[in-house]
Each structure stands twice: as C-alpha cells, then as structure tokens.
Design a protein with these regions (language model features):
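A short, exposed loop/beta-hairpin motif centered on an aromatic-Gly-Thr core
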Residues: 10-21, 92
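RNase H-like nuclease fold core
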Residues: 46-99, 110
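Low-complexity, Ser/Pro/Thr/Glu/Lys-rich regulatory segments of predominantly eukaryotic nuclear proteins
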Residues: 26-52
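RNase H catalytic domain
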Residues: 65-68, 108-186
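Short aromatic-glycine-(Arg/Gly/Cys) micro-motifs in beta-strand/loop hairpins
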Residues: 1-13, 28-38
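Helix-coil modules at protein/domain termini and other flexible surface or pore-lining loops
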Residues: 7-9, 18, 88, 178, ...
Length: 188
C-alpha cells in the first residue's frame, strides 16, 4: 500500500478499488468506471451448506437502485461460468423493479439470438409477472432524466409482443440458495 500511496496521494477525489488479480484490475481499467464502482468483484456465493437444486446451466439477473427512484443498474451472470453475461447502467431516476424487468427481457433477447433456451432466474416476483404480462406496470412518471429508461421499457415491451421464447423464467429462492449470484452486494 505504501508504494501505491506514493502514486495516488494528492488527488483529493481519488477512488480506490481492489481486485483479486492484476488481470481483473487491468480489465476494469479498460472498461466503464460505472460498471465497477460500488460493486463486488465476484458473484454472491451460495449460503454455507446450501445445495444447488437450481439449474446451474442458466442465467441469473439482478438490478440495483440507489433510491426509489434512484440511479439504477442491471446485469446478468452466466451461472455455469460465473462470468458477467451483460451489465447495463447507470440509468437515472429509475426503480429496482424496472431494472429487474429490463434485465429479464434483455436476457431473453440476448439468448434468443443464438437459440439458447436456458433458464433465467430473477429474485423479483414483480418483474417476472410483468414479463409474463408483457407490460412494465411501473407507476414512475416519465421525465427528462429518465427518458432513456422509458425508451428501453418501450423497446422491451415491443420485443415481448413480437417474439416468442421457451426459456423458463423462475424465481430465485434466496432463503434456500443465498443471494442471487448477479447481486450487486449493496444491500444495507
């Protein structure tokens, strides 16, 4: 740390983040800052002694939001490899339920491109029901700051109405399996 400190002292707004490996740190340097700030470096582990009766050859999605509304992110993790399948955000003046909905539809659309019928897990009953109804039933008002989010919602709803899919969309059982592996790890 002392050697590192010499290189970073004097920068009053510097932000610090550690990574398990030099390769992961280098990769993060080449990516968008917002994909890494405030986030765990690894997917959430299963609870001790938890078994995995869920399909490990599947995708897990999750969203995080700093308020209601707030700054929202969403992502998917490939459970067979533990790698990030996609990551989106930040989106301003959004909600967690919107992020969960967009994450599920994004996963469906991405998987459909290659005919992949893997299961998608989400820990949001609300978002799963919105996807089944092909409608994001948010009560959030449209405003200039969240215009991009509403464009994505419109696009997602259109995709649901114009495409079919056979991917099971299942509720992640947090009480049995621990936090969903796509979790951002920022719960208080």
């Amino acid at each position: 740390w002392e050697e590192c400190k010499k290189n970073v002292s004097g920068y009053p707004t510097a932000k610090y983040k550690s990574f398990p490996t030099k390769e992961q740190a280098q990769k993060a340097l080449n990516e968008n800052y917002w994909e890494h700030v405030g986030k765990k470096n690894t997917p959430a582990p299963l609870l001790p002694n938890a078994t995995a009766p869920y399909d490990t050859h599947s995708i897990a999605v999750d969203a995080a939001c700093s308020g209601n509304p707030g700054t929202m992110y969403y992502r998917a993790i490939d459970l067979s490899t533990g790698t990030i399948y996609f990551s989106q955000g930040p989106f301003l003046r959004a909600t967690n339920n919107i992020g969960e909905f967009l994450a599920i539809v994004h996963a469906l659309a991405q998987l459909s491109l290659s005919g992949d019928t893997r299961t998608i897990y989400s820990d949001s009953k609300i978002a799963i029901s919105w996807v089944k109804q092909k409608k994001c039933k948010t009560k959030l008002p449209l405003e200039a700051a969240n215009k991009k989010v509403f464009e994505l919602i419109e696009r997602a709803e259109k995709w649901l109405h114009t495409h079919t899919y056979t991917n099971p969309i299942l509720k992640w059982e947090t009480q049995l399996w621990g936090e969903i592996p796509a979790d951002y790890g920022n719960k208080k």
